[in-house]
């Protein structure tokens, strides 16, 4: 076990004010992420095949892939706050353009652009959170960050399902408006970070550090497997639910269940998981993530699908806050944005290949897809459990200079 930590409420009260502002902006943005979870359903209703809809999600992932590298670089050079604001404004504009797509080429191009423009804020927000919070508080801070993220995720898809029942156009408009609100929050309330070293302007140092960081490699490899599973939630899960005869609103409710569980239970669960070695906690969580979606192979009722989502969510709540804090502890402050960007690349790979391969596999055999997800969860657990040890406080845990 790791050393004793302060009580949860004391840890939350100790978080600086800008952290709470970042949480609020994250909630706004995620609440309004209406379009992507419903894009496959929207496109199939327009007459596109599931495989074509999967390509659009893959194109979004390709844009997300580029966004991780661009966002990581901008976070370390332009600054965290400006990067967040620029991403939100450009993301809002591309969502409005995506609403006008009617051809496959249009969906592919604009989905890729939306993935780039609307997602390059992520390395900046993760880096800013790590900048503002000392190492001993990072598990709680990242858990609270995810609570804000998932509070939006809990209410957003349910709201989107209601809006979609009236008009899918409102999904695009609402997505754009909430992005603009986050941009305003970033401009007026978030601090400006200044990189501590001039060498932060060059990718060479970051790539050299990453190339020799074996612990980082293990995290990345495990994340690749887990990302494939996670992104079935916004690609094949909706089709699986509707193929069983249930409505898009049912899919929205199942997605919201995931968010509600995280909002109410992840922080209390963190008070337990932060006491144990990080890699061991991550391995248990990853295995449960695989078991949850693996169970979908045998789930045919709403209750069974909800049960599968509950197991998946338990694994998510156990693993992800600890893995986020573990990653933050690995990163040198002046390279933090690019470390976070490279980490994000693995999730983009999962989005690209997870959605495309997942859609293809789903078209041939839904059971094979979900059983593959189960196997990948155990693969990720095996990778991350090697060299089990607690997260240590290293010389990488200094802060960046902050100015307003």
Predicted regions and their residues:
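Helix-loop junctions at membrane interfaces in 12-TM secondary transporters
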Residues: 99-110, 297-308
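Helix-loop boundary and gating motifs at the non-cytosolic
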Residues: 12-61, 215-222, 227-254
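Helix-loop junctions on the cytosolic side of multi-pass membrane transporters
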Residues: 131, 175, 186-200, 386-396
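Structural signature of the two symmetry-related core transmembrane helices
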Residues: 82-96, 280-294
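Helix-to-loop junctions at the C-terminal end of transmembrane segments
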Residues: 67-79, 265-277
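Cytoplasmic helix-loop-helix junction between adjacent transmembrane helices
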Residues: 112-149
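Residue-level signature of mid-helix packing/kink "hotspots" within the transmembrane helices
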Residues: 34, 61-69, 153-154, 259-267, ...
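Juxtamembrane intracellular "pre-TM" segments in multi-pass secondary transporters
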Residues: 2-16, 191-221, 404
């Amino acid at each position: 076990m790791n050393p004793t930590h302060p009580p949860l409420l004391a840890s939350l009260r100790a978080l600086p004010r800008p952290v709470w502002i970042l949480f609020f902006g994250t909630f706004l943005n995620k609440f309004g992420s209406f379009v992507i979870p419903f894009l496959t359903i929207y496109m199939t209703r327009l007459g596109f095949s599931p495989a074509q809809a999967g390509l659009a999600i893959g194109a979004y992932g390709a844009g997300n892939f580029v966004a991780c590298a661009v966002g990581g670089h901008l976070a370390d050079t332009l600054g965290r706050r400006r990067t967040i604001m620029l991403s939100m404004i450009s993301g809002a504009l591309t969502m409005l353009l995506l609403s006008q797509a009617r051809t496959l080429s249009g969906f592919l191009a604009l989905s890729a652009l939306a993935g780039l423009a609307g997602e390059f804020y992520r390395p900046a927000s993760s880096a800013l959170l790590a900048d503002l919070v000392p190492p001993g508080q990072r598990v709680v801070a990242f858990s609270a960050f995810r609570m804000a993220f998932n509070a939006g995720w809990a209410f957003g898809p349910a709201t989107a399902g209601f809006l979609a029942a009236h008009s899918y156009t409102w999904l695009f408009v609402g997505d754009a408006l909430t992005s603009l609100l986050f941009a305003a929050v970033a401009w007026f309330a978030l601090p400006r970070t200044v990189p501590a070293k001039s060498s932060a302007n060059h990718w060479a140092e970051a790539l050299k550090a990453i190339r020799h960081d074996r612990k980082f490699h293990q995290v990345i490899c495990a994340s690749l497997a887990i990302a494939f599973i996670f992104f079935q939630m916004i690609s094949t899960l909706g089709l699986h639910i509707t193929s069983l005869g249930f409505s898009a609103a049912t899919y929205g409710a199942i997605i919201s269940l995931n968010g509600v569980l995280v909002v109410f239970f992840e922080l209390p669960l963190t008070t337990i998981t932060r006491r144990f070695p990080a890699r061991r906690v991550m391995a248990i969580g990853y295995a449960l993530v695989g078991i949850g979606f693996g169970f979908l192979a045998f789930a045919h009722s709403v209750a069974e699908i909800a049960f599968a989502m509950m197991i998946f969510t338990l694994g998510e709540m156990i693993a992800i806050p600890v893995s986020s804090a573990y990653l933050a502890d690995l990163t040198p402050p002046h390279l933090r944005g690019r470390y976070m960007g490279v980490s994000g690349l693995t999730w983009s790979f999962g989005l690209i290949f997870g959605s495309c391969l997942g859609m293809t596999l789903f078209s041939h055999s839904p059971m094979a897809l979900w059983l593959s997800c189960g196997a990948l969860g155990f693969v990720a657990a095996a990778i991350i459990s090697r060299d089990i040890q607690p997260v240590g406080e290293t010389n990488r845990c200094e802060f960046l200079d902050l100015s307003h």
